[in-house]
C-alpha cells in the first residue's frame, strides 16, 4: 500500500487538475452561448437560401447552370469541418468515422476521393488517412466569419468547375442540443433538388436582364453560406461537447479524490493502530 504522504500528493495533484477542468467547463459554457447566438442568427438565411436553391433545382430554367446538372461520378470531394483543439469528447472521432466510412464506399466503386480540411484536427487526421488533400485551413478562432472560408470554398468550386471532382459534400457536426451533436454529410454539388413532398407549390422565375450572371453569383453565395453555417454549427457543437466532457472530468476527479481519501484514512488508521500496538507491546515487556 502507498504511504500516506504519497496518497496526499496524489490527492493534491488531482485537486489541481479538478480546478482546471472546472474552469474549462465554465469557459466552454460561456463560449457555447456566444456560438449558439451566431448559429441562431445565421440559420434563417442559410435555410431560406437552401429552400430557394431547392426550388431552382426543380424549376424549368431557361439557363441550366452546371451546378444544377448531375454528371457521372469519377471523383468526389469532401469539405470536412473539425475543431482546432481537443478535449471535446468523441466529437471529432465520430465525425471522422462517418466521413471515412462514406469515402470508402465511393472508393470501393472505383471513385477517387479528395478532401478539404477546415480545422487542425481534420488536417492532421486526413494527412494520416490518405486521400488527396486539395486545401487546408485552421485557426478560425471563436468568432469565424464568411471571409474565413471563402478561400477554401473557391478551391473546391474551381475543382468542380474544371471537372476534377464531380460531387462535393460538406461534413460537420450539427448542434442538436447541449447533450447531443450529430455528424452530418450534406451534398453541396450538384445542388440537391427539394423533395416533391416538401414543395407546397412550384415557383417560376424571371431573370432581368440575364439569368447567367445572376445564377453564377447566387449559387456561389449559396455554397459559401452553407459552409459558413457548418462552421458555426460545428463551433457550437465543440463548446457543448467540451463543456460536457469537462464536467464529466470534474465529477470523475471528485470521485477519485473521495476514493483516495478513504484509502488515506485507512492507511492512517492502520499506522496509528500499529503505533499503539508497539507501545502496548513495549510496556508489557517492561
Swiss-Prot record:
Produces ATP from ADP in the presence of a proton gradient across the membrane. The gamma chain is believed to be important in regulating ATPase activity and the flow of protons through the CF(0) complex. Belongs to the ATPase gamma chain family. The keyword Repeat does not apply. It comes from Pseudoalteromonas atlantica (strain T6c / ATCC BAA-1087). Keywords: ATP synthesis, Cell inner membrane, Cell membrane, CF(1), Hydrogen ion transport, Ion transport, Membrane, Transport. This is ATP synthase gamma chain. NCBIfam families: ATPsyn_F1gamma, PRK05621.1-1. GO terms for cellular component: plasma membrane; proton-transporting ATP synthase complex. It is found in: Cell inner membrane. The keyword Transferase does not apply. GO terms for biological process: proton motive force-driven plasma membrane ATP synthesis. It comes from the Bacteria. One of its GO terms (molecular function) is ATP binding. The gene is atpG. Pfam families: ATP-synt. F-type ATPases have 2 components, CF(1) - the catalytic core - and CF(0) - the membrane proton channel. CF(1) has five subunits: alpha(3), beta(3), gamma(1), delta(1), epsilon(1). CF(0) has three main subunits: a, b and c. It is a peripheral membrane protein. HAMAP family: ATP_synth_gamma_bact.
